């Protein structure tokens, strides 16, 4: 006669119930699969997934503010680091307030084919029919607005005082960028003319670049950067304050671009949408890597540079590759 073994009995019982669980799970997912094949995703589910795409992509783009701060701080002289950090924190704060106060409705309150929206604060008018929440759209568009001003910050590094910079940040993020952005994304006259901009190559980067160019022309070259004769040949590059900090900024920006471009799909509620987002991620990574290789090749052809000098040329190149 076999002696009673509690462990053996317990093992038999566990195997028995595990079998029931696995069988039930298989039956459940079998019927669920049949139901999925026969039905489409509801509008509410699409609304949720689209909203999450906006929010998560916005988080990544917001992180680019840290990337710009690190990249600029690492490449300027040590005496300018604190000013660079203050300007980047300030511009992001100003962008958030101004885009809420007036910017969003200047962009999205434009009549069809028109030129300018309304001078009113943002308000939540979310509806299931839009496909995503208004709040998530506001957040996603706001971080784009801040990025536009970050372009200006890098160009005018070490040549503008903080308070004039903050004043211009309020004007750009509250009025200039929202109005020009609304001409296409807000259904304005550029949209009516057939112009298309998927992820801001014109509306964000050309607008920020034009503002930065205007500022550079007004302010002139930074002291000691070019020869006294006014020639275009640059003098020896400044000693960067921290190459590791600049490198960290490069990778933060690289990461943020996945949200910038991937979120511009504006939808993730269908198989086609999520597949498109994955393709955008791949293209973004290839563009950034290609930009680095191109910049490294060109800088090597120009001069036999030291490693840190080569980095001065290649550090912005992932951004340049993605933008192009």
Indicate where each model-derived feature is located.
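N-terminal secretory/membrane targeting signals
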Residues: 14-38
């Amino acid at each position: 006669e076999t002696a009673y073994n509690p462990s053996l009995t317990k093992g038999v019982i566990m195997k028995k119930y595990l079998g029931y669980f696995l069988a039930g799970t298989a039956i459940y997912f079998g019927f669920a699969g049949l139901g999925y094949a026969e039905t489409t995703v509801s509008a509410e589910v699409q609304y949720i997934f689209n909203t999450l795409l906006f929010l998560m992509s916005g988080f990544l783009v917001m992180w680019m503010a840290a990337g710009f701060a690190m990249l600029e701080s690492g490449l300027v002289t040590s005496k300018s680091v604190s000013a660079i950090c203050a300007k980047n924190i300030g511009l992001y704060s100003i962008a958030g307030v101004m885009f809420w106060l007036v910017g969003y409705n200047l962009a999205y309150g434009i009549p069809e084919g028109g030129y300018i929206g309304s001078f009113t604060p943002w308000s939540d008018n979310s509806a299931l029919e839009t496909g995503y929440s208004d709040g998530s759209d506001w957040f996603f568009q706001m971080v784009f607005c801040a990025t536009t001003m970050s372009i200006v910050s890098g160009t005018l590094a070490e040549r503008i005082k903080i308070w004039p910079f903050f004043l211009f940040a309020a004007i750009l993020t509250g009025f200039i960028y929202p109005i020009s952005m609304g001409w296409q994304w807000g259904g304005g006259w550029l949209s009516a003319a057939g112009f298309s901009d998927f992820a801001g190559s014109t509306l964000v980067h050309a607008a920020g670049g034009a503002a930065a160019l205007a500022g550079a022309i007004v302010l002139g070259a930074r002291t000691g950067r070019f020869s006294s004769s006014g020639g275009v040949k640059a003098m020896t590059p400044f000693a960067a304050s921290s190459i590791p900090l600049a490198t960290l900024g490069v990778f933060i920006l690289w990461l943020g671009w996945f949200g910038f471009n991937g979120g511009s799909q504006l939808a993730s509620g269908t198989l086609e949408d999520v597949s498109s987002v994955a393709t955008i991620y791949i293209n973004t990574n290839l563009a950034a890597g290609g930009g680095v290789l191109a910049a490294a090749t060109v800088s090597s052809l120009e001069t036999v540079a030291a490693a840190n000098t080569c980095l001065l040329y290649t550090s912005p190149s992932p951004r340049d590759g993605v933008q192009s």
